[in-house]
């Protein structure tokens, strides 16, 4: 993947096999297995909220995404996706886009990000590639 610097994946339930496979393929410095918990929501949701408020996080204008974000509830002082699922025309949703955004922010915080870099070509005397 171009510019891939890291990923956080939900390691609960069905996602555990995918998270484990990603960690094996990309290594622990680029793939993080996350057990979503109240503590994780407490650490990550403020990043999500501030990203939306200061407009550094841009969300697509989509009914499913809007529904996911509207489903957030504050439970014991922590914003989180409620346990019950909602339905849309394609089937069940469970705050998928909220969790995806939060996982992206988790990966950026925990794994860092790749700094953009540039390179300078080196001229090789005597090498003529004009015929290629």
Where are these regions (language model features)?
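RNase H-like, metal-dependent nuclease domains and their acidic two-metal-ion catalytic environment used
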Residues: 1-35, 42, 46, 50, ...
